[in-house]
C-alpha cells in the first residue's frame, strides 16, 4: 500500500479529497524547524511519523532519502530560509464508515513563517483529566480539538498555555510542548506512559544529558513538584526551550 505525495501544481494549493480519512481525524503530522533553508532533525521526524503510522495502520511507504528530498524541494520552491515545514499524512480516501481503511495514504508538505517567543511562559492547569491509557496522546495526530480548547482557555485568562494532568493527577504536557523541571541539579520530565507525546526536542535533550553524564529522570510528577522546583521549562521543535514563569499564578 503506497504513499502518494500531493504536490503543488502551478497556482493550485494541494488539498485532500472530501472522502479522505483525515476528515475523520485519521491523520498524523510533523512540524519541522527550518534553519538556513535546511530541515532540522529530519530523520527523527521521519522515524516518528513512520512509527505512528504503523500503529494506526496508515501506509507510510516513503524512504528517508525521498522524505528529505521532498522537504528540500518544498523549502526551495517556497524560498524559505528560516521558518517551519509541516508534513501531514492522511489515512487516504476510503469508503464511508468508521472502520474503513484507505489503501493509499496521502502526504502534503506546507511551509510557514513563525516568530520565536522569548518571554517566559505563564501556564494554567486545565480542569479536566486525561486518561493516560489513551493511545492518542503518544501520537502527533491531527485531532487537536482538546489542545485548541485548552489553549483558548489559557489565553482568555491572560496565560500563554495550558498544562494537562492525567487521572492520577500526574503532570503530562502542555498543548504544544513537553515539560521539564530542575530540582537539586537533577533534570526531571514526565514519563511517556503518563500520557505524553514523545517530543523530538525532549528526546534530544534527554540524549544530550545522558551522553554528558548529567542526571535526568523520567518519572511521574505532581503539581507540587512543579511549584517547588528550582526551575521549570518547556520544549518543542519550533520554540526550542522556554522557561516557565508561573503555574496558576504561583
Regions found by a protein language model. Give the residues of each.
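Short secondary-structure junctions
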Residues: 76-83, 214
